[in-house]
Amino acid sequence: METLANRLDACQETLLELYEKDSNKLEDQIKHWAQVRLENVMLFKARECGMTRVGCTTVPALTVSKAKACQAIEVQLALQTLMQSAYSTEAWTLRDTCLEMWDAPPKKCWKKKGLSVLVKFDGSSDRDMIYTGWHHIYVQDANDDTWHKVPGKVDELGLYYEHDGVRVNYVDFGTESLTYGVTGTWEVHVAGRVIHHTSASVSSTQATASDDEPLSPIRLAVSPVPAPASAASARTGTAPPTNLLCTAPAPPSPPAKRQRVIVGQQHLRPDSTRTVGEGQVECYDKRSISNTNSTAPRWDHGDTDTVPVIHLRGDANCLKCFRYRVQKHKDKLYDRVSSTWHWAGGKCDKTAFVTVWYTSVEQRKEFLTRVNIPKGVIALPGYMSAFV
């Protein structure tokens, strides 16, 4: 016990010295990950022996120590192969060689000098996303484990780099538009420039900016797009505005799966003519649900004292995160949202609910069209009395 505590203290002391040193040498970063690996190996062994504390250090669960040790081994081996390359003399800091940088897109590559790329889906500021492009990307060859330094690029289709003449995308704007957009159009803003795109301008060869073009530190691959000049620009000789809307190409997609919405104990299938995207839920504008044993409707919501709602059922933490995420859509896509609630009494479980209140059925349909329901959460459309 005392020997293990002394060895763990020495390991942690070495880590503190490396943090204070803040070196930019690759060999120090390799040493850092070797110590992280050793620390988690000792914590793993301590937990196996039934210890919960070693000195002042709390011993985590076996799975936690094992996962961190495996991550440290992976990063250490990658840095050791990088040490044998021509880029070992470059400056490598703790930030450059951290696990988050290793796992950031493109994964299993080293990256330097990030650049923010703003994408406005549907041309709306309410649906913009910020992605990180990289000036320099260090790619390891799968055949001989050698490292190659390639420039990061961005065009109207996504963020990518080229290695051995092959384009490798690590962010596909077309795929992202299925999640964050509706119309399949977007604008790409990078370094004060807007990359223009129309579906007719997509080709297999993209014109890339040369090294001497002062566009931005990250290379832009922009297809020339003919734009009709206005009458004013024709007279003055000025170019038309460059803030154009990007239109997504129509990539081949598999047939969309028909998604079910659970209402009470009934399963309603969307109409076969409607395509429901992944993560979206179809809203049914039905004022009554017919009883299978009677021709009379079960509920009549034609009264003016009822409002459309959706009860979201699922894990409590997931519902809390979802409620926080949709706060920015308040007043536009919904009127109010409840706190997390549970049923009390009877045959109740730990299932949580969140109720979303809408001013109209159309607003509820717009909410379900634009907001992705989290996986594992079931949307239950219905009506409630307008008691407040």
From Swiss-Prot:
Q: Where is the composition biased (Polar residues)?
A: 235-245
Principal subcellular localization: host cell
Region (Transactivation domain) residue spans? 1-202
* Keywords per UniProt: Activator, DNA replication, DNA-binding, Early protein, Host nucleus, Phosphoprotein, Repressor, Transcription, Transcription regulation
Under the heading Pfam families, the entry gives: PPV_E2_C, PPV_E2_N
Q: Which domain of life is it from?
A: Viruses
Spell out the residue ranges making up region: Disordered. 227-259
Q: How is it modified after translation?
A: Phosphorylated.
Q: Is-annotated flag, keyword Transit peptide? A: no
Report if keyword DNA-binding is assigned: yes
What SUPFAM superfamilies would the database entry show? E2 regulatory, transactivation domain, Viral DNA-binding domain
Q: Indicate where this protein resides in the cell.
A: Host nucleus
Task: For the region DNA-binding domain, give the residue spans.
Answer: 306-388
**One GO biological process term:** DNA-templated transcription
Question: What are the annotated GO cellular component locations?
Answer: host cell nucleus
Q: Which GO terms describe its molecular function?
A: DNA binding; DNA-binding transcription factor activity; nucleotide binding
The record's function comment reads:
Plays a role in the initiation of viral DNA replication. A dimer of E2 interacts with a dimer of E1 in order to improve specificity of E1 DNA binding activity. Once the complex recognizes and binds DNA at specific sites, the E2 dimer is removed from DNA. E2 also regulates viral transcription through binding to the E2RE response element (5'-ACCNNNNNNGGT-3') present in multiple copies in the regulatory regions of the viral genome. Activates or represses transcription depending on E2RE's position with regards to proximal promoter elements including the TATA-box.
User: Which family would the database say this protein is a member of?
Assistant: Belongs to the papillomaviridae E2 protein family.
Its assembly, as annotated, is: Binds DNA as homodimer. Interacts with protein E1; this interaction greatly increases E1 DNA-binding activity. Interacts with protein L1; this interaction enhances E2-dependent replication and transcription activation. Interacts with protein L2; this interaction inhibits E2 transcriptional activity but not DNA replication function E2. Interacts with protein E7; this interaction inhibits E7 oncogenic activity. Interacts with host TAF1; this interaction modulates E2-dependent transcriptional regulation. Interacts with host BRD4; this interaction mediates E2 transcriptional activation function.
Protein name per the record: Regulatory protein E2
Q: Which organism is it from?
A: Human papillomavirus 27
